[in-house]
Amino acid sequence: MIRLFFLLFFIFDLGAETKVFVLGSGTPNPDPERGGSSYLIMVNKTPYLIDFGAGVVRNFAGLTSEWGGNLEIDTTSIEHAFLTHMHSDHTLGLSDLIITPWIMGKTESLKLHGPKELDLMAKNIIDAYDFDINYRINGTQPQNSTGYKYDFFEIYDGYVYQNEEIRLEAFKNSHGDLEKSFGFVVTTSDLKIVFSGDTAPSEKLIKKSKGADILIHEVFSEAGFLKKTPDWQIYHAAHHTSPEQLGSIANTIKPKKLVLSHILYWGATESQIKMEVAKYYDGDIEVATDLLRIH
């Protein structure tokens, strides 16, 4: 234990404060109350994004003091973004993430971490906005020529990003037959946070999540699932997690807080979803909503 303490002392800033927010709690379904899947980890004044679904930059802005929030930063401070997998509900905000902070004055390149296909997506977005980028740089707008660029880092099973504030480890989860789909274990000096990503029950997730302070896990409505046609039931059972399965997972991991997010409601309410999971798990459960501060 003493050895571990000194190891953490040299790795992390032990005076750091970690804040965790839900930016977007939604799914592919166009729910006007829920943005595309995205989360924010703040360590001191450094933001780290997990996924970037539709509305990511605007929801990020909603947490800043400029727009009535409590964070003394702005969108130009976004430097690192990590992607769990390439599905559209997790990536539709990428063009916003590349372009908008630059328009607002960002000069440093974005650090994109994700499956190798993300690199091609980002290149294609920049190509698609070539006219707008050239107009802003070479027209009368006093715009810099660097802030829309990005550096790419490929994520794989076991990938680790680490600096003096944070350690992020990627692990392969079980999202149907999608080979490059990951969950993340994020460790700071004061928190261990696990993001399930989109997944059916995953033994690797359970192994990686031991000792987690916060487990952010996807789930679907039990009642809604029973109303689905057999073909959709087969699909969702292979790609996602039921309340009973999540209860079993949480009972094994025993996180200090279980956050239900990326919820396939299928007509259920937030309280009904919480009750469905609470039938199988009696720990601290919170239902994610956009701009929720988890910690």
Residue ranges: model-predicted function:
Residues 12, 183, 189-192, 200-292:
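Cap/insert and terminal regions of metallo-dependent hydrolase folds
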Residues 1-7:
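Sec-dependent signal peptide recognition
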Residues 16-194, 272-295:
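Binuclear metal-dependent hydrolase catalytic cores
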Residues 7-16:
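Hydrophobic h-region of N-terminal signal peptides that target proteins for export
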